[in-house]
Structure formats: C-alpha cells, structure tokens
C-alpha cells in the first residue's frame, strides 16, 4: 500500500492531503524541520528533522518507496524521487514527470544565477481556496485512477 510523504515545511495544502488520505485510507507522513515543530500534531504522523539545508529532503529520500506519493515544491527533490518510481505532486496539484525534470532544473538554475546577480522575478501567487480545491481534486482523481 503506498503512502503519502509531504515536504511539510512550507506546504499550504496539508489539510487537503489529510482529507484525501483519510478517504483512501492511506498513511501520510509529514516531514519538517524542527523550526516548524509543534506539540499539536492532531494525531498526524510527523517526523521532525534537524534544521540543516537538506535534512528534510534526505529523510524523505530515505522514506520514499516505489509507488509512494510525494508532495513537494522542491524541484531537485522531485527529480530524485521520480527516479525512485514515486509519483510527485506540487503544492498546486501538478503531477511532475521525469521527462520535464531536465528543463525544470535548468530553469531553476538560471533563476538562481539571476538572483546571484541581483535580478529577482515575482514569486508564485498566493494560494487561494480555488487552488486548494484544485489540488484536492487532482490528488483524488489520481488516486481513483491508480
């Protein structure tokens, strides 16, 4: 039975993930740094890791198995986990595909170089209720068809 792993530090759709997982009776593991520690986890399965730059990513890589569902905005982590045979969603419900990763990583690299030169672009728009609903619908549809 697959599980859902969530890169939870900045994930805006944790409640939606939990609802979908309960409906499909899937386990969810939220992975976050101790910077986001809370004693109130509402019975959810949370794993807290050191605050090091890649600590949460490393834990997720170790936990992920073929067929698992991952939710992350981290393109680098997504590319590694896709290679392990997982299904990776963005926080906006986009299902990443291996054949897109090279281009996405290249764009990420170019944006990082631009930032080093002081050139900044606008970030993503704030999550709306419609965005949350779209994420939930896409994850639900994926699981229904799996």
From Swiss-Prot:
Note the InterPro entries from the entry: UPF0178
Output the Pfam families linked to this UniProt entry. DUF188
To which protein family does this belong? Answer: Belongs to the UPF0178 family.
Q: Which HAMAP family match?
A: UPF0178 (MF_00489)
Q: What name appears for this protein in its UniProt entry?
A: UPF0178 protein Lm4b_01466
Q: Which organism is it from?
A: Listeria monocytogenes serotype 4b (strain CLIP80459)
